[in-house]
A protein has these predicted regions:
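Alpha-helix boundary/N-cap detector
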Residues: 2-5, 36-39, 43, 77, ...
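Short hydrophobic short-linear motifs embedded
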Residues: 5-6, 10-15, 19-27
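Feature primarily recognizes SF3-like P-loop helicase cores of small DNA viruses
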Residues: 22-61, 94-491
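Trp- and S/T/G-rich repeat-edge/linker motifs of beta-rich repeat architectures
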Residues: 64-67, 72-89
Length: 491
């Protein structure tokens, strides 16, 4: 139903309910005397507020109206419903004018009805009404219950799995892609899961994770990375889960997660508002994760965003970050806070090209989404009991990934360098730096930034960089291939 049709329906319903077929009466209509608010934008605003109750709200920081469509609140970028409701007030005033016996009052009502339906009258009415407590609303009030999922057949309490009827007072703006039915079957989906996850512990973990994604809870502070070569089911599963979540799932660009010279525009974060799952597809192995950004997006800190030509506004995260990739991006292996968040889920089974069913995801989405949601809801209950303790396969894969990205350790190992209090040798800083820069050139690392990491690591291990005879030495560092004369000092 369009905003115009919805507004006309509301007006018709109200008129039918009035036995005397008079327009909406408010405080303004019941006042007597020359200074009543009957013939004013303020009086019209009160009529609009009464007519729009439970049907239209206004968010001042966005400068946007929201309308109730029977299941959720949706943004009305054109303000059509508010305008139609305001126009309906003019029609109501004309009806009252025709029914008024007092000739003077009839003329005044008729003139005011004409004034009320011109551009200035409609604009004035809407402008006054939108600041009313019954109309104005903060975006922080929208979708503010992290344990409610708005399904096609009602509001699902994720703690009890009980459905409740849609209610405008719930202030939900999102809608899942299917109805909730605890007994809904999904045979093809379950067979797909069995084929994709040969390790039952990883399958159980994945079910709990997707159940966690039904919620707006972010206490896990995690970024999940689904990794593996092509034809392993990860893209198919993501497409199915995203379809099941509907409005609650969004796709984000990889520039949000990858370190760049220039900051991403704040408009990129708007889609994260009240989402439950944010998916990033395919990162390059030459790209480096932006540790600060990932920690900010997974740590529960307030996110600042804005749409184009809009003031900044803030919100708390409700999304879970999920990366699906064939390649592992680079990451700072020494950043404990980052690696505490990363869970690498290996997709190890590759389907033979001749066995690939290109329509599998579409068939499941078309026929089995309620069953997928029932499976995810069970995972949500299990998550609430057991949280997201990672199975051994995920722990091992994540540790292996961390080792691969530990370029400092790779440099020390490849060059045969020993460092620590137990090492008695001293090494020329100049020779050490030259060997380091040569290694960086071969490894594709930036020498300057990587040297800072190496230096910080050595100092953390108890090594000392000291000045000797006009040169510098690294104490407690031993590097083969450097002569005794060079290790004594730099000239």
């Amino acid at each position: 139903m369009t905003p115009e049709e919805e507004a006309k329906r509301l007006i018709a319903e109200y008129e039918a309910a009035q036995q005397d077929r008079r327009p909406i009466r408010t405080y303004a209509d019941d006042q007597a005397g020359p200074d009543n608010k009957l013939y004013s934008d303020s009086g019209n605003a009160e009529r609009l507020i009464a007519l729009a109750d439970g049907k239209a709200r206004y968010e001042p920081s966005w400068g946007l109206w929201l309308t109730w469509d029977g299941q959720r609140w949706t943004i009305d970028h054109s303000d059509l419903q508010a305008q139609e409701l305001a126009k309906g007030i003019a029609a109501q005033l004309r009806t009252r004018s025709n029914e008024t016996r007092n000739e003077k009052a009839q003329k005044a009502l008729h003139n005011w009805s004409i004034r009320s339906e011109n551009v200035h009258g409609i604009t004035g009415t809407i402008k006054l009404a939108r600041s009313s407590p019954g109309i104005a609303i903060s975006h922080t009030q929208l979708d503010d219950d992290p344990w409610t999922l708005n399904c096609q057949n009602g509001l699902l309490d994720l703690r009890t799995m009980i459905l409740h009827a849609p209610n405008p007072d719930s202030l939900v703006t999102k809608l899942a892609g299917c109805a909730y039915d605890q007994a809904a079957p999904a045979p093809h989906f379950h067979q797909f899961l069995t084929d994709t996850f040969p390790d039952p512990e990883v399958l159980n973990y994945t079910q709990r994770y997707i159940g966690y994604c039904l919620t707006g809870d972010v206490t896990e502070q995690q970024i999940s990375m689904w990794w593996g070569a092509g034809r392993n089911g990860k893209s198919t599963l993501i497409n199915i889960v995203a379809a099941m979540l509907g409005d609650y799932a969004v796709t984000i660009g990889r520039d949000i997660l990858i370190a760049q010279k220039h900051e991403s525009h704040d408009t990129k974060f708007v889609d994260l508002f009240r989402s439950r799952l944010a998916v990033c597809v395919e990162l390059k192995e030459t790209e480096r994760l932006d540790a600060s950004r990932i920690k900010a997006l997974t740590g529960g800190d307030t996110i600042m965003a804005r749409r184009m030509r809009e003031n900044y506004w803030r919100f708390h995260p409700t999304h879970k970050l999920l990366v699906a990739t064939n390649h592992k991006p680079r990451a700072d292996a020494k950043d404990f806070a980052l690696w505490r968040r990363i869970h690498l889920v290996p997709f190890t089974k590759t389907v033979e090209e001749t066995d690939v069913d290109p329509q599998l995801a579409n068939e499941i989405i078309a026929n089995e989404l309620p069953g997928v949601l029932a499976w995810a809801a069970q995972g949500c209950l299990e998550y609430q009991q057991h949280r997201l303790a990672a199975p051994k396969a995920v722990v091992d894969a994540t540790q292996s990934y961390k080792n691969e990205t530990d370029t400092v350790e790779q440099f020390l190992t490849n060059c045969g360098i020993q460092a620590g209090p137990q090492v008695a040798g001293e090494t020329s800083s100049t020779a050490f730096r030259a060997a380091h820069d040569e290694w960086c050139e071969d490894a594709g690392e930036n020498p300057r930034s990587h040297w800072n990491k190496v230096s910080a690591h050595l100092k953390q291990e108890g090594c000392v960089n000291r000045r000797v005879h006009g040169g510098r030495l690294w104490s407690h560092v031993s590097m083969p291939g450097i002569t005794q004369e060079t290790t004594q000092y730099d000239r």
